[in-house]
């Protein structure tokens, strides 16, 4: 039987570019990713997304658009990662390095998918087109997808 861990992920998108962070420590270290983390007791998923974005990048946002929800299973683990994905098109502040992440802008045609989670290349196009999606990815280790499902949806 699986338990579930509630997590957030925020992608900051500007015309022609996306802000990613190089994860410096912990789960996913050495990979480029959006900004996010665990939902803490007493906060909503959106509050957690805003808090994690601020902590990891120094940015604040007025509006977050929920764009996706992906459940991740890692073979041998008993906990599913239930990741709620948001897109932010406007922000305040300047991206700043934190203990956990080093932010960097990437042109849309130069996103470093080879240095990211293997699933990102599959759902990023939907996110960039502002299309909503639901997904499930089963990983062997941290690099090999053994099974997946990804569907575009009207609402989340």
Swiss-Prot record:
Keywords: Cytoplasm, Hydrolase, Magnesium, Metal-binding, Mitochondrion, Nucleus, RNA-binding, Transit peptide. Mg(2+) 2 binds at residues 52, 55. It is found in: Cytoplasm, Cytosol; Mitochondrion matrix; Nucleus. It is an enzyme of class 3 (hydrolase). GO terms for cellular component: cytoplasm; cytosol; mitochondrial matrix; nucleus. It catalyses: 2-oxo-dATP + H2O = 2-oxo-dAMP + diphosphate + H(+); 2-oxo-ATP + H2O = 2-oxo-AMP + diphosphate + H(+); 8-oxo-dGTP + H2O = 8-oxo-dGMP + diphosphate + H(+); 8-oxo-dATP + H2O = 8-oxo-dAMP + diphosphate + H(+). 2-oxo-dATP binds at residues 8, 33, 35-38, 117-120. A motif (Nudix box) lies at residues 37-58. Oxidized purine nucleoside triphosphate hydrolase which is a prominent sanitizer of the oxidized nucleotide pool. Catalyzes the hydrolysis of 2-oxo-dATP (2-hydroxy-dATP) into 2-oxo-dAMP. Also has a significant hydrolase activity toward 2-oxo-ATP, 8-oxo-dGTP and 8-oxo-dATP. Through the hydrolysis of oxidized purine nucleoside triphosphates, prevents their incorporation into DNA and the subsequent transversions A:T to C:G and G:C to T:A. Also catalyzes the hydrolysis of methylated purine nucleoside triphosphate preventing their integration into DNA. This is Oxidized purine nucleoside triphosphate hydrolase. It comes from Danio rerio. The gene is nudt1.
């Amino acid at each position: 039987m699986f338990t579930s861990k509630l997590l957030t992920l925020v992608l900051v998108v500007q015309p022609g570019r996306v802000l990613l962070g190089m994860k410096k420590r912990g789960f996913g270290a050495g990979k480029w990713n959006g900004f996010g983390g665990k939902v803490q007791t007493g906060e909503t998923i959106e509050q957690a997304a805003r808090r994690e974005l601020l902590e990891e990048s120094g940015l604040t946002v007025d509006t977050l658009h929920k764009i996706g929800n992906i459940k991740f299973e890692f073979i041998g683990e008993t906990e599913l990662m239930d990741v709620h994905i948001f897109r932010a098109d406007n922000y305040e502040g300047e991206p700043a390095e934190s203990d956990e992440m080093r932010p960097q802008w990437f042109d849309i045609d130069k996103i470093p998918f080879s240095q990211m989670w293997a699933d990102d290349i599959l759902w990023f196009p939907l996110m960039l087109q502002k299309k909503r999606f639901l997904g499930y990815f089963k990983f062997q280790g941290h690099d090999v997808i053994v099974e997946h499902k990804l569907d575009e949806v009207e609402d989340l």
